[in-house]
Amino acid sequence: MAFQKAVKGTILVGGGALATVLGLSPFAHYRRKQVSLAYVEAAGYLTEPVNREPPSREAQLMTLKNTPEFDILVIGGGATGCGCALDAVTRGLKTALVERDDFSSGTSSRSTKLIHGGVRYLQKAIMNLDVEQYRMVKEALHERANLLEIAPHLSAPLPIMLPLYKWWQLPYYWVGIKMYDLVAGSQCLKSSYVLSKSRALEHFPMLQKDKLVGAIVYYDGQHNDARMNLAIALTAARYGAATANYMEVVSLLKKTDPETGKERVSGARCKDVLTGQEFDVRAKCVINASGPFTDSVRKMDDKNVVPICQPSAGVHIVMPGYYSPENMGLLDPATSDGRVIFFLPWEKMTIAGTTDTPTDVTHHPIPSEEDINFILNEVRNYLSSDVEVRRGDVLAAWSGIRPLVTDPKSADTQSISRNHVVDISDSGLITIAGGKWTTYRSMAEDTVDAAVKFHNLNAGPSRTVGLFLQGGKDWSPTLYIRLVQDYGLESEVAQHLAKTYGDKAFEVAKMASVTGKRWPVVGVRLVSEFPYIEAEVKYGIKEYACTAVDMISRRTRLAFLNVQAAEEALPRIVELMGRELNWSELRKQEELETATRFLYYEMGYKSRTEQLTDSTEISLLPSDIDRYKKRFHKFDEDEKGFITIVDVQRVLESINVQMDENTLHEILCEVDLNKNGQVELHEFLQLMSAVQKGRVSGSRLAILMKTAEENLDRRVPIPVDRSCGGL
């Protein structure tokens, strides 16, 4: 076995060397292409944005209605679709984009939040001497560097630790990671390095210590995916593209080409989802960039077309920030079933994922309990046994549909393409499918190149390399200090605004409400534990937010960070949006219900509430569960599913017990796993299970609730020393 591993390592080293040598010949064309692109960017003329601010949605709809014919109409408002619109409009093409939901409402907002070259692809490229895989990695690393440059406020390098538990893995993975640095060349973010066992545990104290021999740390990029997607859309709008969300394509328009006599796609019949109004948008070329819905649009063109999309669901979960170091991620390269799991800090929380399961295409993917538990089990395997990973620690969960594709022009139509595919139908519909977030720009460039060539459009080369996205041009790491000094914002809020809006953060700050406090002067928070402020709701409407779901999931990221916090903020968000958009009381109620449904099904709330008595982590007899539920509901009169300080105070007052708020707060915090000021039923059941199993000696809250229950039945006062005595 050891010999086998040694051979593997030798192959990796030899393959790496061979790939490096081969890079001088088969990859020379690719390198020349990159050099050529860089030269075009240096010498070409980049037009300034035609709009200082993105036009309103109403103005964009008027442009869509009144323009006789666009050069390009893009269907789909994800990263690739918005990238196509930006690429086309900056070439001087008259461009339109329509999206049936919100920008980034699908897969593009449900990623792992990484901007990466693909370490796994490089491993396959070297082991199999696969030129295509190498090209993919090389291209992705080039795009990674560009994305970090054009949106510095939304992205940053992130060190990722690869813990190793066998000695042979150290040289094996070290060579592979060093090859990753080598392929990146001058665009390498930072050089990878090896950590000893003790140093690895210093960085990641919760790591499984047994048999740990050391770790390797390498660098990739991380970003705020939905905000990045939105920045691309807003930049395209500022450059003159007519972009509109909530515009559904009902059918494709066609006309006969007078030269060939063939039918050509000439636009689309579009429906405003918010008003129901329909109208035609005509274009010389239509680009299908609809992600998982690729085949739905292709069937509008040709109902007999062979499907190319093979959808796969990837589930992620969010856990409290203390599960990972603040500035370092972790990679499990070989899970129990051969998948790869990332464990990453993001927005002061921890993201864990992903899974890879065949699925059906749907507008509302739901994370399954099976996938959530798979991720939790993998997390448990990598963390010390001292750390109890609980189902209740999952603050949010989501499923994104990866649009994996087969190449219709390939001889083997069943094999999934590892790269993106640009397909042109007989009627001229351009379809871009596959690929990954990191390479959205090069995918867009290839797509518009194909459109220009096939439809004989008058356009120059792509100009998007180095083109700053909305908010990036005048951003600096110290910009937040000016926000604190000039507007009187909290430092945490100012840092959040600078990271989210870049140089546009000042516009948000100007909208901030006065708090009425000595400090901060302005910036009323939507929820106390997150730095989102009310002014962001007003500004979000300028960024084309049309619904409460848009606001909690893509303008802010509350839904992706903590579903309960998002639910808590919803009434105020709906009130603020209703004021700005003149919503009726009925519309406000509908928005509240729709957003609550979104949190319940799509963001993991349903899975969470259904697992309150999951036997895998609560080992109580059914009779005990019933008894403890009854005790819990003595405090939770409204059947909310959780109790707060107010609930405890109410019960104590009813039995004539006085206790100061600070003591009560301390008692609840002992059990409050999510640190959200609430103790949920499953948290209480976990506590009682732990008490029975002897994992904890007792709990002040457990004693308090037991004593209160007894006295509520007997209606006699509880002695103060019993209610809050130490254990």
Swiss-Prot record:
Enzyme class name: oxidoreductase
Cofactor(s) demanded: FAD
MF terms (GO), sorted A to Z: calcium ion binding; glycerol-3-phosphate dehydrogenase (quinone) activity
Catalytic activity as recorded in UniProt: a quinone + sn-glycerol 3-phosphate = dihydroxyacetone phosphate + a quinol
Compartments, as annotated in UniProt: Mitochondrion inner membrane
Residues noted as binding FAD in the record, renumbered to the chain: 71-99
Modified sites of kind Phosphotyrosine: 601
Positions of Ca(2+) binding: 672, 674, 676, 678, 683
Any single biological process term in GO: camera-type eye development
UniProt-recorded name of the protein: Glycerol-3-phosphate dehydrogenase, mitochondrial
Species annotation: Mus musculus
